[in-house]
Amino acid sequence: KTQMDLSWYNIYVAHKCFEGDDSLLYKNYYDYLLENRICAYTLPYDTAGYYTDERILQYLNNPRVVAFNPIAWKKDADADRVRAAYKFLSQNPAWMEKSYFYVVDEPTDKASLDRVNAVGEVLKENFPGYKMMAPEHVNYALNKDSTADNFSAVQNCINVWCYKPYFYTTFAEYRYSSYTPGQKLTYW
């Protein structure tokens, strides 16, 4: 499955379209990606989790759409919005299968990790069977005396992992120094 950001703002600024066009420009970009088997996080005609525009059904029912963010990218995952999304999407198991929450990008500091967990609690209470991802590009210890790391800090809420191959190779300098005591420089 593929997902990527497709920024409404950047599209409309690049085209100097400031008066609105009923989402046509965004839809054209989204459709181009979809033709090439790439799904953007936010569906055309998305209403941030409330699903009030019936034109969105053409995307929810499209077999090429394999993933989307149920509340749209960069929208608050408050309980009302999440409940509304669940109420609508749970009408069709295929829509639920395509639903992936992505609300915090690359959480690395305490505030962003706490935000992941806070959203996770909202999802647990209001969107049964939720799938939430958080791209992890590094994995740090939570503090210098801790064996806990970013991964462990959010493991109770994240259930779709997006990591880089070196995500699990943590604390490289420390680990390598134990194999090469006294050596100042190591290549790998």
Describe every region a protein language model picked out.
Residues 2-9, 30, 119, 123, ...:
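Generic ordered-secondary-structure signal
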Residues 1-75, 90, 94-98, 105:
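An acidic-aromatic substrate-binding cleft motif
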Residues 43, 97-146, 158-166, 184-188:
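Aromatic-lined carbohydrate-recognition surfaces of secreted/lumenal glycan-active proteins
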Residues 3-20, 148-169, 175-188:
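Long, low-complexity, intrinsically disordered polar/charged segments
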Residues 30-34, 52-68, 81-96, 123-127, ...:
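Acidic (Asp/Glu)-rich catalytic clusters
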Residues 18-23, 41-52, 73-81, 108-113, ...:
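Acidic-and-aromatic substrate-binding clefts and catalytic sites of carbohydrate-active enzymes
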